[in-house]
Amino acid sequence: MIAWQAAALILVGVPEVLLAQSAPVPAHPAAQDFSEADRLRGGYGPYRANNDLLYYQLDVRVDTVRQTLSGKNSIRFKMLKPGRRIQLDLVRVFQIDKILLRSATGAPRALHFERAAGRTVYVDFPETLRQGRIYTIDFYYSGRPVEMGRFGGFVFRKDPMGRPLVNTACEEEGASVWWPNKDQWRDEVEGMEISVEAPSDLIEVSGGRFQSKQELPDGYTRWNWKVQYPINNYDVSLNIGKYVHFGDSYGDLSLDYFVFPEDLEKAQRQFAQVKDMLYAFSRFFGEYPFPNDGYKLVEALYSGVENQTAITYGNHFENGYLGRPASGIGARFDFIIVHESAHEWFGNSITARDRSDMWIHEGWANYSESLFVEYMWGKQDAITYINTGKENVKNQFPVISTEGVFSTPPADQYKKGALFLNTLRSVLDDDAEWFSLLHDYYQHFKYQTIMTSDVLAYFNKHTGKELTPLFAQYLRHAAIPVLQLKFNAAEHTVGYRWAAEEAAFDMPVRVGRRDDWQLIHPTAEWKTLESPIPMDEFEVATDLYYIDVSKQS
């Protein structure tokens, strides 16, 4: 935004701390202020780091009448270091019935376990597990889930017609709200199997490829699914309801949709948008990441979550997001279809290694919305669309939060993350190079867990530019940079410099008149530009760069 007044300095939304060039605003409480449960849950301590996840086989039964859950998770892992203990996670509302170590030569052996702070479960072995060896344990549990987090985690509900409905949504609270696992983001299984026993009058849908179902003698049906790609824990899903199914295809990719019967016709119309989305994102990033598992949308009562290959959808089969906006660019497409599907590339295929770097999911997915707009309606509409997000950015805390503890980054990770990427595009000032970078960035990191340092190193290397100060200013500091302008009408000059918390910040920016921009290269030191443009007509391309501007005469 630009604020100006002759003979005065006006700054709108610019903290005094920024102009004083003082230390960054702290993001969240310091690491020592977090609880032991937060440190165990968010850290990658020795009993997580000593093993590498290989495979899960999750087998559960859901009782929709008693609202209970029981079953086991078989966990296969390789020891990276010798040890006698590993760390797993399960919320305390569940009872741990037993944990068994499989043996190739005899009966399974019961293992000792200890529940520590929060949801931590230490599993102890009678002998030292050898480095490089592969082991499998069966973790049996039972209990009644308790709703947690924004969308509930594991939720028993009734659909609008009063029929039983069960959905999962646990990105915020973690998968251990409903099943035992190594609940962190750094280490992912290479694949998994999901088997769910549900009442036979209902349909169960999980991520992965449908394998089979078996009618059981007690009124339950067992649904079997197989995930054939790496998957993070929170993306493992379970949905049980009175669903009807309809299918389609996009080339060789299967498209499967599960909705309430009364919503079938609306869904058939609204979900036609999926093909445009798939084409756009495949064009920008590469093919859909999980072709062998297919693409699914599953109706839910909350707005939607990016469960891998089984995205939950609750946007009322309308464009926009839950009825907003009523007009404008955002009203031209279904936000949930576009945003949550973007997570298949950014969040599910590429996953942040630590929650502190969650902008790698949300900032990139939010930016992908503007790319969809650009594909459908052109670049100018995309720029307009992405700039509508500015009103939602608070700039109170850095986008990247405290690493190594359980801490959710601020909501700015969404819009500010996207605005940063739009700014980066403008800095590079070469759309052909930008789109090539986006495609190659995704291809380079797909099916991996990464940190911001990896993103930065990639862009530094492949642009040949030193982008470290730019990344640091937008992601590791709270405030955005201010372009300070000082006008001398008599001499027809404009002084300019950056006021930014990152000392080496030196981003180029376009100024002057919109139909004839001039590129300047401000630093922290004053420079001078000859310009006959009066102060009240002198523009800055704030739609291309996420900055504040101050004008002074």
How would you name each of these model-derived features?
Residues 17-20, 31, 225, 257-501:
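Hydrophobic alpha-helical and helix-loop surface patches within well-folded domains
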Residues 20-70, 97, 157-164, 468-469:
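N-terminal, polar/Ser/Thr-rich
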Residues 25-27, 92-158, 218-219, 528-533:
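A surface-exposed beta-strand-loop module
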Residues 35-37, 138-243, 544-547:
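Extended, low-hydrophobicity, Ser/Thr/Pro/Gly-biased non-transmembrane segments
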Residues 58-61, 75, 110-112, 124-129, ...:
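Beta-strand-rich interaction surfaces with strong enrichment in secreted/lumenal proteins
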Residues 74-93, 180-184, 189-199, 453, ...:
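Surface-exposed beta-strand/loop patches in extracellular or lumenal glycoproteins
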Residues 83-109, 201, 510-519:
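Solvent-exposed beta-hairpin/edge-strand motifs
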Residues 96-101, 467-468, 483, 487-542:
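Beta-strand-rich binding/interaction modules
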